[in-house]
Amino acid sequence: MSRLEQRFAELKAEGRSALVTFVTAGDPGYDASLQILKGLPAAGADVIELGMPFTDPMADGVAIQLATLRALEAGQTLAKTLQMVREFRVDNHTTPIVLMGYYNPIHRFGVEKFVAEAKQAGVDGLIIVDLPPEHDAELATPAQAAGIDFIRLTTPTTDDARLPRVLERSSGFVYYVSVAGVTGAGSATTEHVTEAIARLRRHTDLPISVGFGIRTPEQAANIARLADGVVVGSALVDKIAQATSADQAVNDVLSLCSALAEGVRGARR
């Protein structure tokens, strides 16, 4: 059983949803980013998505584009992102880490080398937003062969004809993007999310995490009553953008994470 499978199974037994937090590796700088990463589990994050900075983040909204820019300007590379996971794993062997980003940096790094180093570092899953199922052989197949889950995005525009193809080789969990568009845009209604989850459950037994547009503990709680996981990214990244120092960035991100965790954990009581 993978770390992701284990975590979702534990939370299902507890009768609650997972808080899945997204931050960009290297934002606002390596040391502060590592502090945030190490602090998230104690602040209530059940699963961590760690963004791999890339110069052309086309699926991301302004908040995450700016986070990517800050990280790249601070010298973040894919090699440093993998090193960050290694350092995280020195003290934490239970919290799943999913790397999220685009295929280009991995392709340049070398797929075989990347998969081997990601596995060795302690990466549990990958979300590659610009690599559709038709290109499974390029990364999904070698990653899963190494024991790294490959997580697919589904959206309101993924119809019933397309869904089986998207979900066919998915593992870990399914990430439902509740609003069509870039990250951080709007938020979906409870009715919409309820219908979408019911539709996905007809096609897969994997846990379903819902993201995009969730910013407050109240919104997180609403989704936590419906989904197996609640993904929050832009709201956390905004705290880094608004901070006037690295220490403030760390404190503000972890404070918001704690508030979100409280919302998620109290949702089904």
UniProtKB/Swiss-Prot annotation:
Pathway: Amino-acid biosynthesis; L-tryptophan biosynthesis; L-tryptophan from chorismate: step 5/5. GO terms for molecular function: tryptophan synthase activity. The active site is at E49 (proton acceptor), D60 (proton acceptor). Its EC number is 4.2.1.20. Keywords: Amino-acid biosynthesis, Aromatic amino acid biosynthesis, Lyase, Tryptophan biosynthesis. It is an enzyme of class 4 (lyase). Pfam families: Trp_syntA. GO terms for cellular component: cytosol. It catalyses: (1S,2R)-1-C-(indol-3-yl)glycerol 3-phosphate + L-serine = D-glyceraldehyde 3-phosphate + L-tryptophan + H2O. The keyword Ribonucleoprotein does not apply. InterPro entries: Aldolase_TIM, RibuloseP-bd_barrel, Trp_synthase_alpha_AS, Trp_synthase_suA. Tetramer of two alpha and two beta chains. HAMAP family: Trp_synth_alpha. The alpha subunit is responsible for the aldol cleavage of indoleglycerol phosphate to indole and glyceraldehyde 3-phosphate. Belongs to the TrpA family. This is Tryptophan synthase alpha chain. The lineage of its organism: Bacteria, Pseudomonadati, Pseudomonadota, Gammaproteobacteria, Pseudomonadales. The gene is trpA.
